[in-house]
């Protein structure tokens, strides 16, 4: 199975950016999907924007995929949204779940972030059946808040939300934009039988990356950030490969697909 993970960078401030507005980047994302041909796609930051197409319209240009999109606060404009898309010729979606990173995770709710900018954060999961093997596995997509206390509480709640859905021996891929590389994340998941798969994260020309968030280019064309925020974890996953589907020089000098790098996961 091949999974592509990407925060598509639809923050509300991007709508009028001369370089990073959605109209400049949407086709770059489609080109990336067509080049990599993943079986499953995980998108974060699929927010609605006032002055451009919704992600539901965008997904019409990926006709080979069925998809699930969930909003943190349905009907509220600034809701955060996640997508899990999949190739229906290879996979059957058995079930789907959405939970909230909050004190009431079973119902639409805001979390522990800044009250003026908290529109809820969710985890979206799907169980799939491979048509050619009858093997089942779970895929979970997450996007944490940027607030430090919200991140901490989300980390501690995360294993419980997953374990309530999955059997102890279920094969699981957990990926997304965690907005942190804090040791608490890695230790908490390790203590709950998750392996950190994305420690071996290279470009296509085998340059090791310790960064997944590169920010926007400045007026001189230089990338402005170097944080490691996007991670992949697995349970009962033993044969896998993780990479960024671009060469290092392209990332440094030309990449504008998003402020995050895409991560590709291949697993058996």
Curated annotation (Swiss-Prot):
<dbReference type="Pfam" id="PF03372">
    <property type="entry name" value="Exo_endo_phos"/>
</dbReference>
<dbReference type="InterPro" id="IPR005135">
    <property type="entry name" value="Endo/exonuclease/phosphatase"/>
</dbReference>
<dbReference type="InterPro" id="IPR036691">
    <property type="entry name" value="Endo/exonu/phosph_ase_sf"/>
</dbReference>
<dbReference type="InterPro" id="IPR050410">
    <property type="entry name" value="CCR4/nocturin_mRNA_transcr"/>
</dbReference>
<protein>
    <recommendedName>
        <fullName>Uncharacterized protein L388</fullName>
    </recommendedName>
</protein>
<dbReference type="GO" id="GO:0000175">
    <property type="term" value="F:3'-5'-RNA exonuclease activity"/>
</dbReference>
């Amino acid at each position: 199975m091949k999974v592509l993970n990407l925060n598509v960078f639809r923050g509300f401030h991007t709508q009028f950016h001369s370089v990073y507005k959605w109209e400049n980047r949407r086709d770059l994302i489609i080109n990336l999907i067509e080049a990599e041909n993943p079986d499953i796609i995980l998108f974060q930051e699929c927010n609605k924007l006032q002055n451009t197409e919704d992600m539901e319209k965008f997904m019409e240009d990926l006709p080979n995929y069925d998809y699930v999109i969930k909003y943190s606060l349905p009907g509220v404009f600034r809701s955060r949204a996640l997508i899990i898309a999949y190739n229906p010729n290879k996979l059957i979606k058995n079930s789907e779940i959405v939970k909230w990173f909050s004190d009431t995770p079973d119902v639409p709710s805001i979390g522990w972030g800044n009250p003026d900018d908290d529109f809820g954060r969710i985890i979206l999961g799907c169980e799939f059946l491979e048509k050619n093997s009858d093997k089942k596995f779970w895929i979970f997509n997450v996007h944490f808040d940027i607030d430090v206390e919200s991140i901490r509480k989300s980390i501690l709640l995360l294993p419980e939300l997953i374990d309530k859905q999955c059997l102890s021996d279920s094969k699981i891929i957990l990926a997304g934009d965690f907005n942190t590389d804090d040791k608490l994340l890695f230790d908490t998941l390790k203590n709950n039988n998750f392996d950190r798969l994305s420690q071996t994260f290279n470009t296509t020309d085998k340059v090791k990356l310790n960064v997944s968030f590169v920010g926007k280019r400045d007026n001189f064309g230089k990338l402005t950030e170097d944080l490691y925020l996007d991670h992949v974890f697995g349970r009962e996953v033993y044969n896998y490969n993780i990479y960024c589907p671009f060469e290092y020089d392209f990332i440094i000098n030309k990449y504008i697909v998003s402020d995050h790098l895409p991560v590709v996961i291949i697993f058996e």
